[in-house]
Design a protein with these regions (language model features):
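Basic, low-complexity intrinsically disordered segments
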Residues: 1-131
C-alpha cells in the first residue's frame, strides 16, 4: 500500500506475542526511508534473531509503519547502491501492477512452490479461514 500511495516509511514498529502472554515490542527508525518489503523484513528478522526466544511459542506478530514521507522527497543516500535500489523499486512496482491486474496469486517467490511454501494453500483465506 505504501507504493500505491507513493510514500516511504521511516519507522518500523513490531511486536511478537508469546502464546503464554507477554512478548517483545520494538521500534526502529531507518536512516533511509523505504517502501520495500525486503528492507522492512530485514530489520524485523535482525531483531527477531537477537531478541526472541527460539524455544517459545508465538501467537501474534504485529508490524506497523510510521513517519511517512513522499517518494519525491527522498534524499539521495551516498552509502547505498542507488542503481540496485531503483532496480528493486521498479521490480516491486511491476509486481504490484501484476497483482492489481491479475490477482495476488499471479507472481510468487520460488520458495512458495517448495514443499515448505504455504502461500498457494492460503490464497483465498482470511486469518486462516475460508471467506
Amino acid at each position: 500500500r505504501l507504493r500505491a500511495e507513493k510514500k516511504l516509511a521511516r519507522t518500523i514498529h513490531f511486536s511478537f506475542g508469546y502464546a503464554e502472554g507477554g512478548g517483545i515490542h520494538k521500534q526502529y527508525t531507518l536512516e533511509d526511508p523505504t517502501n520495500l518489503e525486503r528492507d522492512i523484513f530485514k530489520v524485523i528478522n535482525y531483531f527477531a534473531n537477537r531478541l526472541c526466544d527460539k524455544k517459545a511459542l508465538y501467537r501474534t506478530l504485529s508490524v506497523s509503519l510510521t513517519q511517512f514521507i513522499k517518494e519525491s522527497n527522498r534524499q539521495l543516500n551516498l552509502f547505498i547502491d542507488e542503481y540496485e535500489r531503483k532496480k528493486d523499486v521498479k521490480l516491486a512496482k511491476t509486481i504490484d501492477h501484476l497483482h492489481l491486474k491479475y490477482g495476488k496469486g499471479i507472481v510468487s517467490k520460488a520458495t512458495s512452490y517448495t514443499e515448505a511454501g504455504t502461500k498457494h494453500g492460503r490464497l483465498g483465506l482470511m486469518a486462516g479461514h475460508k471467506m
